[in-house]
Amino acid sequence: VYKRQMQELLVRCPDLDGVVCVTDTVAFGAMRALREAGRHVGQDVGLAGVGDSWAGSMMEPGLATVRFYQKQVGQEAARILLQMLEENGSSGPVRQVTLGYQIVERGSL
């Protein structure tokens, strides 16, 4: 599916020079489609994903990605859930939570 979506994007935007995918898995399909279209990832077109999957570092070129800190996400989710339980299930006011991330630059950019 992801490969087909990238193929369709290349038809609509033949001069495309960069793609950021919602996950690393989507980026893997995009990378395959780009290669099959004769595009050189990291040279003709930059490609990045989100999630920092181990497979991304094994690709050639390595997949640039955004790394989120899952432990921090889990801790914050647990804290909010416990707070809701203490308040008898009330979600209370809408709150904004800012979590850390790291951009991992690899050869696909």
Protein language model regions, located:
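Short, small-residue-biased leader/transition segments that mark boundaries at the very start
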Residues: 1-2
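Flexible loop/turn connectors
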Residues: 5-109
